[in-house]
A protein has these predicted regions:
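Histidine- and acidic-residue-rich, metal-dependent catalytic cores
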Residues: 1-185
């Protein structure tokens, strides 16, 4: 029921919110353990300022304006390497196709809490070609109209770094192929 086409920036924002809260908790734990409150506040404030800056950068990458330089892609990967703790089973509540992809790469739910990367290209983000591979490649036996299209490696790739790292515009190779395939069909 909750599966819709939506902007996943909201999901990413929530992960940043978790890290923000973790910075608050770490500060309170340090102070409760006898650390200098002013120094601890400085650490927390610096961490939270970095989180604000990192999220603003990720959000800007999501808009898909100008060309995304190598340095920007490297920064996305650096930001994405931060971790957070997931306390709920990620197998629960999934639609059948998504659950099938997840079970193919992770038949057993990992022990909880599970450490997750802030931004990730996970195996279950990739939708492989199956029997629905369109007959538009030059040498495909069912290509009756002589199309010569290059199929991307996957039918769809929902990887977060893969999508945020699009160099120009907002379409992945998979998205662009799907549009062109609809045109020729």
């Amino acid at each position: 029921k909750l599966e819709v086409i939506y902007n996943r920036i909201h999901e990413l924002r929530m992960r940043f919110e978790v890290l923000w809260r973790d910075a608050d908790i770490a500060h309170l734990q340090r102070v409760a353990s006898g650390a200098d409150a002013t120094a601890s506040e400085g650490e927390r404030d610096a961490r939270q300022a970095q989180l604000r800056d990192d999220f603003a950068f990720v959000a800007q990458c999501n808009v898909g304006g100008e060309f995304l330089a190598d340095a920007a892609v490297e920064r996305l990967h650096a930001i994405g390497s931060q971790t957070w703790l997931r306390h709920f089973d990620n197998h629960l509540g999934l639609a059948s196709e998504e659950l099938k992809r997840l079970l193919a790469v992770a038949p057993e739910a990992p022990a909880l809490p599970a450490t997750e990367r802030l931004l990730a290209d996970r195996p279950e983000h990739v939708v492989p070609w199956a029997d629905d591979r369109p007959p538009v490649e030059k040498d495909h036996p069912n290509n009756r109209y002589g199309f010569d299209m290059v199929l991307p490696a996957h039918k769809q790739n929902m990887g977060e770094l893969h999508n945020l790292g699009i160099r120009r515009g907002t379409l992945t190779d998979e998205d662009r192929f799907k549009i062109n395939d609809h045109i020729v069909q």
